[in-house]
Amino acid sequence: MKRLGSVQRKMPCVFVTEVKEEPSSKREHQPFKVLATETVSHKALDADIYSAIPTEKVDGTCCYVTTYKDQPYLWARLDRKPNKQAEKRFKNFLHSKENPKEFFWNVEEDFKPAPECWIPAKETEQINGNPVPDENGHIPGWVPVEKNNKQYCWHSSVVNYEFEIALVLKHHPDDSGLLEISAVPLSDLLEQTLELIGTNINGNPYGLGSKKHPLHLLIPHGAFQIRNLPSLKHNDLVSWFEDCKEGKIEGIVWHCSDGCLIKVHRHHLGLCWPIPDTYMNSRPVIINMNLNKCDSAFDIKCLFNHFLKIDNQKFVRLKDIIFDV
């Protein structure tokens, strides 16, 4: 599986952004919108955006695969956030139009406690051995997904630590117009970040599964490359999102040669998301578990067992996958 950049922090927008004082269509109760101007940002230009690989921005929750307890483990995103007093000081500092990077944090006292197994995200800056909060006052990080942790039950549904495998959605290796759901060794995903999508994630924009039979999958970041993207102009991108079948996606993430990731979200361009007919649901999908040695070893209710029952079947679209339970 070809590796592109991994998502270890918030990605900047490809365009310079401006704040508009009107209710956000992305976040409820947010009284402002962050919109893209027509100017390509310095960060994007410095990262050589014109030579970058554009990929689909998938709407889910970010995950990471790295070692825990001497084996590959799935980790869930958990950002450390300031306690109430520190958050109040930080907000007052921002209201005075100061640069958030100049705010002084006492990491040991200003932040809510993290689980013992929490680790900071890879690219987090450190001073004197302490992670430095980002411009939002958060410290990005990860916690391992334990099998019986109810808080991360949807994460744990897509991994099996006994057989060290994960349920992954990607292009079929021999047909780029066909999607494939397969059981992938966790060792093949080490040090990669992925997006968890499904029934109980972010309002389920792709319409997967049902309340009775939830369905969740992992998608490696950068898995869906965009082949025919227009020029990097505001109006051309708006037209592409609105008029092209391939544009029925949440946004674009450019993977730059220096490892930098740059994005644009439909909301940056004043466009709606979620939308009724996504590009992800316009392509057929095949189930290819390839798990003979494990056939009888799965819990009867687990996702791996459900997918084994429909192994080698082809569906017109992801939405059509229904388990006969």
From Swiss-Prot:
UniProt KW keywords: ATP-binding, Ligase, Nucleotide-binding, RNA repair
The keyword Nucleotide-binding is assigned to this record: yes
Function summary: Functions as an RNA ligase, in vitro. The ligation reaction entails three nucleotidyl transfer steps. In the first step, the RNA ligase reacts with ATP in the absence of nucleic acid to form a covalent ligase-AMP intermediate and release pyrophosphate. In step 2, the ligase-AMP binds to the nucleic acid and transfers the adenylate to the 5'-PO4 terminus to form an adenylylated intermediate. In step 3, the RNA ligase directs the attack of the 3'-OH on the 5'-phosphoanhydride linkage, resulting in a repaired 3'-5' phosphodiester and release of AMP.
Effect in UniProt of substituting R77L: Reduces RNA ligation activity to about 12%, in vitro
GO BP term (any one): hematopoietic progenitor cell differentiation
Entry protein name: RNA ligase 1
The protein's Enzyme Commission number: 6.5.1.3
Record gene name: RLIG1
Cofactor section: Mg(2+); Mn(2+)
Result when mutating T55A: Abolishes RNA ligation activity, in vitro
Species in which this protein is naturally found: Homo sapiens (Human)
Disulfide linkage: none
One example GO MF annotation: RNA ligase (ATP) activity
Effect of E250Q: Abolishes RNA ligation activity, in vitro
PTMs per UniProt: AMPylates itself (auto-AMPylation).
